[in-house]
Structure formats: C-alpha cells, structure tokens
C-alpha cells in the first residue's frame, strides 16, 4: 500500500508545476510515511513562510530553510512594519550566528532579495562571521604553531629536547568553525547578495574584498580567488559609481595576469556604464576620470542578450 501510494504521488508530481525536486524530497522523507497526504499537501500549498519562521518552538532546520527560500519581503508585499522588523531580525540571526551553514545560506540568499536599508550592514557582518566561530572562539588566543613543537626525544639523538611533546597552552579540542570550502562558499554568497543592495557602502566593501584597497586593508578571504571573483560579480551588480572605479582598478591590476578577473571586471564595466569599450585599462581609466554615469538598468531580456554576445567573443 505504501509503495503504491508513493508511486502514485510521484507520478502525479511530474504533472504539477510546483517543482519536482521539492515533491521528490517530500515523498522520500520520513514524514511522508507518517502523514503522506499532509506532507504532499504542504508541497502543493506551502505554509506561509512568516508562520514557519515565527513558530515557537522553532521548526526543523529544513522547514526554516525552505521557508526562507519562499520568503518575500513583508514591506513590499502588504506586510506591517512589525512583520518587516521581526523577519529581518530572524534572518540576521540566521545569517550571522546560526550553527547550520545551510540555514546561513538560505538567510543570506533571502536578504539579497530585500530592499531594506539595513540589509547591507547585515550581509557585511555575515561575511565577517562566515567562519562559523562563536564570539568566544573568535576572541580566544590562537594555539602555538604545531611545527614549532619539538617531538619527545628531540631532533637529534645526541641532544636533549628543549621542549617536550604537548605544549600546556595548546588547546586539546579539534578545530572549531566551518570547513574552508564552506566558509568560502558562504562568503561568496554574501558578496553576491550585498551587491544587489546597490548601496555605496556595499560598493566600498566589495572593492576592499576585490583587492583594490591594497594589501594593508585586505578583508578576510580576499586571498581566495573564488571569493575575489564573487566580489567582482557583486560589484558588477552594484549600481554605484564607486563600483565602476573599483572594477576599472581590478581590470588594470589583473590584465595579463588573472584572465577570469580581468574578463569579469570588463563585463561589469560595460554593464554598469553601457559603454562597449575594449578591455583596455587606459580607456576605462579615461571613463573614470571623465566622471562615472551609471547606465539605466537593462531588462532581463537585454541582460541575457548582452551576456550571450559577451561570452561568444
């Protein structure tokens, strides 16, 4: 009976426009065994994201993440100011301090769809805390370099060791925070989302991560090529004159060095200014010196055509 019901629901799911991935997740979940019709019903007619995110006690991480993916900004969808403030606080907590990287991803992505003036600052904080460490762990002194610890017995049979095996100051627990790949992915998502806020402070932050402010003021993660590429993508979407200045600097720095960064910065410059100039740093410096004017934002169709033409070159 259970197997027959699963097959029937799966077949029906293929005919529904609700998203086959969500339906498949539902019918293969433990909840489907306990309450199949209720589980499928929630996929076809999902619960209000505001209700899910406000639930007390909190819903499961999976439910909250899916609610964040469906979430629309209350202030732009007939919500109250109280709705806006509460949801923004919920997303801020999830994006900057949640123990689950999955929930952080979902919250950061949701914030990227908001137009609230507070979003840029939240996303920049989320970038800074993407390592997954708690405040206490971040403030704790670092343990000594393991390479500086001389093993028991010393380095020579004829000489007594000056230090023995375990340093008393070395922490005895494993590494804290997220894995490096997870940290990098979270930072990239933050940069792409902060670029969609179109705020001057967002452009300045992205420029710092992209490496235009010099080594002395480098942001955490700016030595990661993928993070720098995400910063350039963020600048390409951030419709501010400072973004054009930063992209021109990246193009100048990376021409003949990093092909990907140079190509991305050139694409961003053309997108923001509407000027179809070659990837010559000198010509783009002239544009900056003449005074930057941001071109009207292209429609989705125009953007698709521009991208297709650009990547065929």
Regions found by a protein language model. Give the residues of each.
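Terminal, low-structured helical/coil segments at or just beyond the last alpha-helical repeat
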Residues: 274-313
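HEAT-repeat alpha-solenoid elements in large eukaryotic scaffold proteins
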Residues: 23-29, 61-74
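Amphipathic alpha-helical scaffolding segments comprising HEAT/armadillo-like alpha-solenoid repeats
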Residues: 40-55, 77-96, 116-176, 199-218, ...
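Residue-level detector of extended alpha-helical repeat arrays and alpha-solenoid scaffolds
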Residues: 64, 104, 120, 187, ...
């Amino acid at each position: 009976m259970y197997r027959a019901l699963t097959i029937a629901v799966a077949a029906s799911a293929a005919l529904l426009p609700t998203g086959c991935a969500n339906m498949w997740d539902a019918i293969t979940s433990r909840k489907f065994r306990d309450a199949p019709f209720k589980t499928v019903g929630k996929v076809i007619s999902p619960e209000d994201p505001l209700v899910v995110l406000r639930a007390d006690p909190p819903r499961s991480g999976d439910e909250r993440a899916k609610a964040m993916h469906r979430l629309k900004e209350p202030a732009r969808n007939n919500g109250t100011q109280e709705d806006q403030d509460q949801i923004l606080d919920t997303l801020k907590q999830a994006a900057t301090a949640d123990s689950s990287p999955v929930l952080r991803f979902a919250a950061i992505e949701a914030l990227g769809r908001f137009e609230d003036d507070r979003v840029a600052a939240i996303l920049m904080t989320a970038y800074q805390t993407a390592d997954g460490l708690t405040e206490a762990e971040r403030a704790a002194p670092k343990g000594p370099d393991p390479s500086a610890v001389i093993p028991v017995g010393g380095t020579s049979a004829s000489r007594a060791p000056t230090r023995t095996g375990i340093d008393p100051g070395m922490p005895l627990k494993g590494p804290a925070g997220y894995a490096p790949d997870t940290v990098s992915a979270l930072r990239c998502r933050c940069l792409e989302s902060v670029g969609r806020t179109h705020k001057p402070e967002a452009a300045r932050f992205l420029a710092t991560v992209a490496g235009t402010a010099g080594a002395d003021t480098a942001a955490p993660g700016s030595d990661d090529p993928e993070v720098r590429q995400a910063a350039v993508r963020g600048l390409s979407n951030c419709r501010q004159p400072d973004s054009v200045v930063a992209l021109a600097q990246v193009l100048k720095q990376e021409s003949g060095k990093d092909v990907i960064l140079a190509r991305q910065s050139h694409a961003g410059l053309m997108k923001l200014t509407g000027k179809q100039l070659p990837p010559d740093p000198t010509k783009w410096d002239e544009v900056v010196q003449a005074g930057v004017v941001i071109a009207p934002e292209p429609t989705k169709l125009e953007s698709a055509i521009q991208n297709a033409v650009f990547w065929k070159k």
